[in-house]
Amino acid sequence: MDRCPADAITLNPDHAPQLHTSACTGCTGCVPACPADAIEHEAVSAVSLLQQARQLVMQGQSEINVACNAVTDTHPGLSVHCHASWNPAVLASMAAEGVRILHLEGIDQCNGCPAHHGSSLMQQTEKDYATLNKSLGIQLHISHKAKEIVVEKPLPVAEPEPQRRAFFRSLIPTLTQGAAMAASQIGQAVNQATALEIPEADTEHDSHLPVRLQLFLRALPRLQANFTPMPFMPSLPLGAIQANARCTACNQCVEQCPTKALDIREFGANKILEFQPDACIGCRQCINTCPEDALESLPGISLPSVLTQRARPLIMVHEDMLKKEPDRSDRPELKEDD
C-alpha cells in the first residue's frame, strides 16, 4: 500500500490487499514492493530481464538501453512495461552480470503516459540502490538518457594491392566466417550452460523467499560486499533480529516465521534459538507474536553475514527458563459419571 502512488490498494476486513482498478494506473510499482511475491504482472519478470541482460553482456555490451512502453521509437536493448517496476535487488543482480551503465529510455515521458508514476517511483528506487551500494563494491550507474547510437564511418577505399597480397587478403573473409561460426557455436554452448532459470530452492529457506531476493542472494558473492551495515529497506527485504534474556524458547516465533529463519535446537538440558541471516525478510512477525517481548529488530544487516549461509545462535535458554508444559499430575481424574 505504501508503494502505490495512486492509493489503489487497501486492506479488506480480512487484512488481505484489495486492488481498486478504477484508481490503478498500471505502473506495476506494487509488484516488486511485495515481500511475498503475492502481486504479479505478466509484463514484470526479474528472471527474464536478467537473462536478457546476461546475453547482451556476453555479446560485449556492458552499457545497456532499457525502454519503457512510453517509447515508440526505441533504441536496441531491453524493454520494461514501466520504469516503476525496478527495485534495488534487480539492479544489483544486473551489476553482478556485468552491466555497468543502465540507460532508462522514456523515463522523461511519464507525465504524458497512462502509467504516469514511473519517474517518481524510480527516484525512490535509486535512493535505495545508492544506500545498498554503500555495502557493495560492484555497482552500475543509472542514466536517464537513451544510449547514444554510434554510427560507424565508412572505411576509406583501399589502393590497389600487389597480386600476391590480394590473394592472401581474399582468404580473410573465409577465415573470418569460420571463426565467427566457431565463436557462435561456443557462445551457444556457454549460453545454454549459463542460462538464467527461475531459482530452484537450494535450501528449505529459499523456497519461502521472493524470487528477486533469491536472485540477489545468488548474485551477492560477485558484488564484493563489505561490512558497512545496510539498513532495512522494504524494497530489499533483508532483516536481522536479536534476542534478550527474557526468551523462554516457547517456539512461537519459530512457528510464526514465514521463511523458516528461526529454529530451536536442544543443547543438553538447555535450548538455543538460532537465526538464519539469509532467510529473514524483516516482516517482524516473530517480534509481534513473542509473548515475552524477547525479540527486537536490528537497525542494519551485515551482508557478509548473509554470505555465510549458516545459522547463528541468538541466545541459549537455560533449563530453569524453559517454558514448561502445564503440570496435570495433581489434577483429579474425571470419572465417567462426572
Where is each model-derived feature located?
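Ferredoxin-type iron-sulfur electron-transfer modules in oxidoreductases and energy-metabolism complexes
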Residues: 14, 263-277, 302-305, 310
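Ferredoxin-type iron-sulfur electron-transfer modules and their immediate structural context
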Residues: 1-3, 61-69, 73, 149-260, ...
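Flanking helices and flexible, charged tails adjoining ferredoxin-like Fe-S electron-transfer domains
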Residues: 29-152, 285-338
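Cysteine-centered iron-sulfur cluster-binding motifs in ferredoxin-type domains/subunits
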Residues: 1-7, 18-37, 242-260, 274-293
